[in-house]
Swiss-Prot record:
It catalyses: a ribonucleoside 5'-phosphate + H2O = a ribonucleoside + phosphate. The keyword Hydrolase applies. It comes from Clostridium tetani (strain Massachusetts / E88). This is 5'-nucleotidase SurE. Belongs to the SurE nucleotidase family.
């Protein structure tokens, strides 16, 4: 298969490097990723300034690689329009440093890059790896990504489908398996810390994660040692309440 790789941690991150090294064993890959870290950029795009595209090299990676001065969504958009000389079969975003569970999905540049691919009718997978006590296992996540690409190909994955995948911080042999599940109820209780320095006042976002989830969710199963897979789409319409809202007017 012909795959486009992207991420939000930047073109020089270990996550995308490990992913590329694993997937190039069986696939043709092209990399288009942000020149710097673009975490939590969600689906933002650049509209008021030009994007700069620079071809770079990654050691031991057999792929044409582009460093782009934009967001993860920018990278996919500009790759589709200006970089790719022929279509790709799938877009893989990641491997993200840290999970994208529950409401994280809405803030995630990793997931949004995958959703941008779906907007272009290209199937995509967003890969994220758990960080636990400062440790992360990119090798496990990359191996899982390779398996999922094969499974997706065998099942003719649709172009408007995104798989949000989160891999526990475990060796592959210790994983309990794959679990398809829904988003969990995860919120970020935020507050801003006031900082006064050099006669200037600034505010730094702080806070804690609060998990309010059912035993059918990505958060629950990841904690149990499963790789979680949540199918996503970009239509945010709340169909359950549409008729009720129609009756308001």
């Amino acid at each position: 298969m012909r795959l486009l790789l992207t991420n939000d941690d930047g073109v020089n991150s270990k996550g995308i490097y490990t992913l590329a090294k694993e997937l190039q064993k069986e696939h043709e890959i092209i990399i288009a990723a942000p020149s710097i870290e673009m975490s939590a950029k969600s689906h933002s795009i650049t509209i008021a300034k030009p994007l700069f595209i620079k071809e770079v090299e990654l050691d031991d990676i057999n792929a044409t690689t582009y460093s782009i001065s934009g967001t993860p969504a920018d990278c996919v958009k500009v790759a589709m329009d200006k970089i790719l000389d022929k279509p790709v079969d799938m877009v893989i975003s990641g491997i993200n440093y840290g999970t994208n569970l529950g409401i994280d999905i809405l803030y995630s540049g990793t997931v949004s890059a995958a959703i941008e691919a779906a907007i272009h009718n290209i199937p995509s997978i967003a890969m994220s790896a758990e960080v636990k006590n400062g440790d992360i296992n990119f090798d496990t996540a990359a191996s899982i990504a390779r398996e999922l690409v094969k499974i997706s190909q065998e099942n003719s994955m649709k172009g408007n489908l995104v798989l949000n995948v989160n891999v526990p911080c475990l060796d592959k042999d210790s994983l309990k398996g794959l679990k398809v599940c829904q988003m969990g109820g995860r919120t970020f209780t935020s507050y801003f810390e006031k900082i006064e320095k050099n006669k200037e006042v600034s505010y730094m976002l702080k806070g804690e994660l609060t998990n309010n989830h059912k035993p059918t969710t990505d958060i629950h199963f990841l904690r149990k040692g499963y790789t979680t897979i949540t199918p996503l789409h970009y239509d945010l319409t709340n169909f359950k309440i549409m008729n009720d809202v129609s009756n308001w007017f």
